[in-house]
Amino acid sequence: MIKPLHTKIEEIQNLKDGYLIRESYFEYPKGKSNIYKVSLSKKIDWYAELPFEDDVYSNPIILKENHFICASWKGVDSHISLKDGSIIESKLTRWTKKQSEQEDQPNVFHSLRSFQT
C-alpha cells in the first residue's frame, strides 16, 4: 500500500514501472507538486513540474501512452512526460480579469510551454 506524503491520495494510476499519484491539493505544501511517480519499490522517481510555482493540480489525471494531462487550480492544462515529470506542453484555459491585473501576472504566458506534435 502506498501512503500519502502530505494529505490524502485522491487518485492512483497504475503504470508498467510504478504508480502515478495525485494527492489532494487542499492544504498541500505550497510550491510542491501534488502529483508524483512512485516506483514499484515504493520510492519517489519524480514530482510533476508545476505550471506556476504556487499552483497545484486539482483535476483528474488523463493517462496517455507516454504522458498524462492534468489541469491545475489556476486553469492550466499541462501535458506531462511520464519519463521525468516535466511539462512538454501547457495551455492556459482560464483567465480572469482579477488575475490579469495582478502585478506578478503580466509575463504568465512566457512561462507556458508548447510543443509541436
Predicted features and spans:
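Secretory-pathway ectodomains
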Residues: M1-T117
